[in-house]
């Protein structure tokens, strides 16, 4: 009998950016449609056996407030017997939901759960609806912006504007090529708007123009290196993964997509938050007895 946590399936909505028809749609509705889509493509799972639903959210306010994971679960048709929670670790929130559900499975607390995330950067203002800063923390630059943090990291590691722009250009090229080749189709749950419009493609990736990228002004410092072309866009969307124990999957005829071999978290100086994945990755590799050379694909949230 194995309590090892396994991934059965994972899906997401299209990611909406500026100009997307998804803007204005309630994020709990988006998350509900995503979870419902996940369940519909895993018909062998009895939804009455789902024990917990965990969604990560950086700003659980407004439509993403009021325990959005519970609301999304109800909209998806999950029975009221399933619990729900919302986790905030900013950009790592959804990943932390995966940590929580898989840890609960391995501890024997539950056998099946859903982990994911939801965010609406258009309805929720930067900093939230009512930011309230602690002066003692403000004096230590605790509330540093993502843009300024990126500038500090670029300074520390001598990452030039040219290197950032080349990476951004390559990233958009790859994303557009993958989208056109249908590489994302299997992971996207089409979202239906109130007027019946169906959205099934990301709006963020675009055919990049090197000259336009070079012409942009720095976004966060007058003499900075980070521009709109090398920054993350405002986004709206949701994701969900079906996680079970290995024993549960085998017992119920669920195809295992991946085994969760290990987890780790690590802290760094808050002004250098962008470097956090480095010590966390080192810890995860050490705990699992792997080296970076054993890894074929890396993804950072």
Predicted regions: what they are:
Residues 119, 125-128, 147-152, 254, ...:
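Conserved N-terminal phosphate-binding loop of PLP-dependent enzymes in the Aspartate aminotransferase
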């Amino acid at each position: 009998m194995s309590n090892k946590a396994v991934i059965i399936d994972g899906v997401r909505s299209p990611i909406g950016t500026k100009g997307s028809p998804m803007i204005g749609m309630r994020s709990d509705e988006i998350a509900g449609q995503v979870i419902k889509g996940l369940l519909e493509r895993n018909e062998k799972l009895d939804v009455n056996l789902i024990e917990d639903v965990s969604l990560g959210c950086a700003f659980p306010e407004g439509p993403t407030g009021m325990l959005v994971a519970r609301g999304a679960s109800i909209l998806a048709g999950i029975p009221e017997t399933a619990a729900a929670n919302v986790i905030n670790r900013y950009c790592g929130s959804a990943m932390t939901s995966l940590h929580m559900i898989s840890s609960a499975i391995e501890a024997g607390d539950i056998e099946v759960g859903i982990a994911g995330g939801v965010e609406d950067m258009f309805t929720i203002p930067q900093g939230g609806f009512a930011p309230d800063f602690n002066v003692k923390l403000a004096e230590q630059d605790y509330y540093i912006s993502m843009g300024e943090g990126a500038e500090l990291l670029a300074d520390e590691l001598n990452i030039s504007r040219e290197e950032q722009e080349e990476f951004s250009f390559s990233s958009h090229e790859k994303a557009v090529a993958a989208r056109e080749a249908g590489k994302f189709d299997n992971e996207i749950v089409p979202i239906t708007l109130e007027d019946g419009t169906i959205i099934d493609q990301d709006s963020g990736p675009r055919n990049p123009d090197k000259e336009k990228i070079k012409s942009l002004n720095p976004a966060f410092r007058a003499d900075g290196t980070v521009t709109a072309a090398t920054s993350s866009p405002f986004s709206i969307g949701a994701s969900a993964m079906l996680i079970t124990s290995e024993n549960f999957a085998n017992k119920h005829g669920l195809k295992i997509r991946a085994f969760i071999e290990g987890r780790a978290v690590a802290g760094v100086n808050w002004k250098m938050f962008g470097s956090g994945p480095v010590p966390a990755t080192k810890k995860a590799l050490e705990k699992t007895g792997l080296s970076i050379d054993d890894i074929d694909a890396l993804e950072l949230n």
